[in-house]
Amino acid sequence: MSVDQTLYSRARAAMADPTCAGPATFTAAGAFSQPDLMAFSLPEEEPIWGFDTIAPSMASWQGKMEQQTFCNPNMERGLKNTHVRNGQPTPPPFDDKKLQTPMGEMYPVAQYAFNSSPPEYAPPKHRSSLSEQSQTDGYGVSTRRRKASAVDQSEQQQDREKREKFLERNRLAASKCRQKKKEHTKLLETRFREVSSKKGELESEIEHLRSEVLNLKNEMLRHAQCGDEAIKIHLAQMVRLITSKDTPNRDLVSPMRSPEQMTASTPHGLSFGFDGPMQLPSEMGSPLDQRRDSEQSIMTESSYTFSTDDSFEELINV
């Protein structure tokens, strides 16, 4: 049995062992036994191993070992690091750092069966992709929030501008309304002053006209007994108006009676708005009696005084 066949068979048995919980580890006792070492043909011409006791003629075997491909790189690395001392192969130097094997080297056969390059770990990439995705999601959310906040700020700015315009229009309308109200108030005040002044003028004119009418009536009454027909007719109209107010239920003129009978039946002592009775001229009297009566009426002072204000108002309206 050759060395390469023995090592390959032992490595395959260690890997196929179902009781082995972890990967096959390299041991000197398991890899090389005494009968296997005795099968080596070591010529003494070539000192490969650096010992005088062993004649290394392992050139051909070393070439075979270099050409041999091992499925387990750990075993190959262990064989390269082994030393043969006193005819016994020794394990490589103990290293604490190499005891902690990474998770990627637990099952090397399954990993290197499909790809001869060193394994690339997917979980860190997945974590980095998740972090990148979370970063991109956070960036998208932040951008959306910024956009929403910008939209809200623009809407608030538009609402504020609309409110300012509305308030400005209200202020302008209120100022115009106040100005119109002031102008209307001034116009009313001016009109009130004008109407008040006109009213005062009219009242003074009424007083003047009243005094003038009173003077004219006094003058007419002073000439009542002169025998003028116009004065007599005017006095007769005044008598009819006054008697109509004194006796409202009586007819002024009866259709069956003539004006002469009415004047004859009229008593001579009516008030006519005067305090003292006034003697009316009689149609049947003599001219001497008429003259005497007229002189008597002129000489009486009480005939020119009026009784009430109502009769005076009626005299004005004649």
Curated annotation (Swiss-Prot):
Which locations, inside or outside the cell, does it occupy?
Nucleus
A Pfam family found in this protein is: bZIP_1
Q: Which UniProt keywords apply?
A: DNA-binding, Nucleus, Stress response, Transcription, Transcription regulation
Q: Cite a single GO BP annotation.
A: positive regulation of aflatoxin biosynthetic process
Q: Which Gene3D superfamilies match?
A: 1.20.5.170
| Stretches the record annotates as Basic motif | 160-199
bZIP domain location, by residue?
160-223
* Tree of life domain: Eukaryota
Q: Which PROSITE patterns does the entry link to?
A: BZIP (PS50217), BZIP_BASIC (PS00036)
One molecular function GO term is:
DNA-binding transcription factor activity
Gene Ontology CC: one annotated term: nucleus
Where are the annotated segments for Leucine-zipper?
Answer: 202-216
InterPro entries assigned:
bZIP, bZIP_sf, bZIP_transcription_factors
Which SUPFAM superfamilies does the record associate with it? Leucine zipper domain
Deletion phenotype: Leads to a decrease in aflatoxin enzyme levels, down-regulation of aflatoxin accumulation, and impaired conidiospore development.
Span list, region Disordered? 79-100, 114-164, 247-304
CDD domains under this entry?
A: bZIP_ATF2 (cd14687)
Q: What does this protein do?
A: Transcription factor that acts as a key player in the regulatory circuit that integrates secondary metabolism and cellular response to oxidative stress. Regulates the genes involved in development, stress response, and secondary metabolism through direct binding to their promoters. Particularly involved in the resistance to oxidative stress in asexual conidiospores. Binds aflatoxin gene promoters carrying the cAMP-response element (CRE1) under aflatoxin-inducing conditions.
Family, as annotated = Belongs to the bZIP family. ATF subfamily.
Q: What is this protein called in UniProt?
A: Basic leucine zipper (bZIP) transcription factor atfB
According to its UniProt entry, this protein's organism is Aspergillus parasiticus (strain ATCC 56775 / NRRL 5862 / SRRC 143 / SU-1)
